[in-house]
Amino acid sequence: MGKKRTKGKTVPIDDSSETLEPVCRHIRKGLEQGNLKKALVNVEWNICQDCKTDNKVKDKAEEETEEKPSVWLCLKCGHQGCGRNSQEQHALKHYLTPRSEPHCLVLSLDNWSVWCYVCDNEVQYCSSNQLGQVVDYVRKQASITTPKPAEKDNGNIELENKKLEKESKNEQEREKKENMAKENPPMNSPCQITVKGLSNLGNTCFFNAVMQNLSQTPVLRELLKEVKMSGTIVKIEPPDLALTEPLEINLEPPGPLTLAMSQFLNEMQETKKGVVTPKELFSQVCKKAVRFKGYQQQDSQELLRYLLDGMRAEEHQRVSKGILKAFGNSTEKLDEELKNKVKDYEKKKSMPSFVDRIFGGELTSMIMCDQCRTVSLVHESFLDLSLPVLDDQSGKKSVNDKNLKKTVEDEDQDSEEEKDNDSYIKERSDIPSGTSKHLQKKAKKQAKKQAKNQRRQQKIQGKVLHLNDICTIDHPEDSEYEAEMSLQGEVNIKSNHISQEGVMHKEYCVNQKDLNGQAKMIESVTDNQKSTEEVDMKNINMDNDLEVLTSSPTRNLNGAYLTEGSNGEVDISNGFKNLNLNAALHPDEINIEILNDSHTPGTKVYEVVNEDPETAFCTLANREVFNTDECSIQHCLYQFTRNEKLRDANKLLCEVCTRRQCNGPKANIKGERKHVYTNAKKQMLISLAPPVLTLHLKRFQQAGFNLRKVNKHIKFPEILDLAPFCTLKCKNVAEENTRVLYSLYGVVEHSGTMRSGHYTAYAKARTANSHLSNLVLHGDIPQDFEMESKGQWFHISDTHVQAVPTTKVLNSQAYLLFYERIL
């Protein structure tokens, strides 16, 4: 009877709390306290029993480069096995062994978290219940029990001697650093610069590596202090010119993810703790993105994007709620007039979020018609740049895929350009670089057939074929739209107050619904094949940066979103007449904003300018120097911002040339005038240099049906000049300056393979850059350059922190690079 009574009880849940997890139903069957106490008598802690019997402990301990896997304790029988991040996965195999009763509950001996294999989720516990009492008992036994000297074998003695030698070396290095710090005290830092280790919560090395670099970003810590200030008042200029007084709004406290981030950065600056456990911050990230739950191997760049997007979304929500309170209406039901007013004020936000102020930059895509030489610009923001990494094998194959139908004169003129073009376009398209020639030819034929069908359909229905060549950017950075993709492939835009101004690269498009962890279907339109494919995000493992080739939805100029027909074409006939490459326009600049009152604001701004064609594609410095060295980060930036030719199926629909052919502008009646497609020139350059530049090297690629990692070493400098990749009118750059310098302060390195790898971080402990802080906080642009701040590099692998020379950092296999602006 007692069991029935306890079985029927339910745990009271507070609706206001977000931290409570669902109660595991397998605790009673997976927990055996009597067997556990017997098994923990005279046991060696934190050692996998199966690896020890296989004589693999000694071999793994001798390798300094390989990290020791986490050990999990079975709460049913006391078996100790290595976790999922190890090669053997003995703890998982122990659970999968058929038995009469399940051995599904395991306890991590590193961070004392409980995991249920049946639920495939973490089990929450407290000290009052049975599970919490068992965990407390195991922790006491682990702290009390110590191995006796007589029981130690020769192998363990050798291991302890090696550990003592390492500890003595570390102490000597620390003494040297302390002496150097005494001789050269920091000038601008009132507090001591510290680098601490981070506890691995279970395959969270991808998270720890990114957090180490963010903790060495002083500007982020300063802005978070400003955001946390209570009673912050923000003034927003009125959207209507008739209203002269700005709207004053009182901001609420920041969201839980932002508060957890601020708490984590403050904890990293404390000098008392040697190792920090970022459990609260990681749990908040998992609430924004459910894919990070489960302690699986994940991707660092994906984690960084979700983290920044989550904090930015919370900041936009603060502003939206403040605007509603300023109008005296905080209810969810609003009339249409008030809704429009709120959205107008949201668009007029004078101060961007702290994420955009630190990591935000701007890209400008320029397209020029070869006949009328009219220039059109597309501006969009970004948080990081995903750069292509070309493998030697893919580069050789792509060179052989040149079009053999070209004349000899064209080959002589464009041979070098076509080699780069083919290799780069192939890397961006959905045709894998490692596929056979037969599949590649078949894909090209299919693309040509679809292009012909689209041309025929366009003549019949008066549709336009290549708006994507004008209105979207073919590079791996695309504006992030808060879009909800339905299973039928239709694009439904959520009416939300959150302004998504970030950029997601085309291979991996994340929207706000991803942050809520809801699986969905995404319909993608690739650039080369113009075909549609549906990708089930729920069934795809995104570990280790497996990229999904998707593109963000495209809007036309009237605010209507472009939907796909049954034949895969894009219906953009309505509203295209508003976008014209009209060289006869008198104003120098016309902004064509793709905003609609009923939708969330986007970040792309289209404009047609009367700009000199000779200087439109010029950069602040010479860029041709970096076209030779293919193994450098400068060459990756060169490929990312390279000049492209829009020809053949990618021709530009030029309204100026169309009007000239029709002898002047006339009313566009269907079937009366013929559209003119011309060759065009296209290039993407940086038009706003971010204070903190984040570069992502796309090392993980798909070759046929297999996944591979490009282990090629990419050289990256300690001082990077971004001027060869910036426009002449680059913002945040003084008029006479021809250099845009950045200093390296953080690296995320991935070692291993696609299936089993490890992330580590290189971070530079240094003094804060005062000029950079003034730029971010106050917008001051100094005329002269500040010297690079000196500091000490550290290599951090979870809890292990070691000082390293600069040469070791520059020789690492970088996956993410963090640069700060030198001003």
UniProtKB/Swiss-Prot annotation:
GO molecular function: cysteine-type deubiquitinase activity; cysteine-type endopeptidase activity; histone binding; histone H2A deubiquitinase activity; ribosomal small subunit binding; transcription coactivator activity; ubiquitin binding; zinc ion binding
Acidic residues bias: start-end ranges: 409-420
Chief location category: nucleus
Residue sites binding Zn(2+) 3 per the record: C74, C77, H94, H103
This protein's GO CC annotations: cytoplasm; nucleoplasm; nucleus
Keyword Ubl conjugation on entry: yes
Biased composition (Basic residues): 438-458
Disease / disorder: A chromosomal aberration involving USP16 is a cause of Chronic myelomonocytic leukemia. Inversion inv(21) (q21;q22) with RUNX1/AML1.
General function of this protein: Specifically deubiquitinates 'Lys-120' of histone H2A (H2AK119Ub), a specific tag for epigenetic transcriptional repression, thereby acting as a coactivator. Deubiquitination of histone H2A is a prerequisite for subsequent phosphorylation at 'Ser-11' of histone H3 (H3S10ph), and is required for chromosome segregation when cells enter into mitosis. In resting B- and T-lymphocytes, phosphorylation by AURKB leads to enhance its activity, thereby maintaining transcription in resting lymphocytes. Regulates Hox gene expression via histone H2A deubiquitination. Prefers nucleosomal substrates.
Subunit structure: Homotetramer. Associates with late pre-40S ribosomes. Interacts with CEP78; promoting deubiquitination of tektins.
Additional facts recorded: USP16 may contribute to somatic stem cell defects observed in Down syndrome. USP16 is triplicated in Down syndrome and its overexpression may contribute to proliferation defects in stem cells. Reduction of USP16 levels results in increased proliferation capacity of Down syndrome fibroblasts.
Domain writeup: The UBP-type zinc finger binds 3 zinc ions that form a pair of cross-braced ring fingers encapsulated within a third zinc finger in the primary structure. It recognizes the C-terminal tail of free ubiquitin.
Name of the protein this chain belongs to: Ubiquitin carboxyl-terminal hydrolase 16
Species, as recorded: Homo sapiens
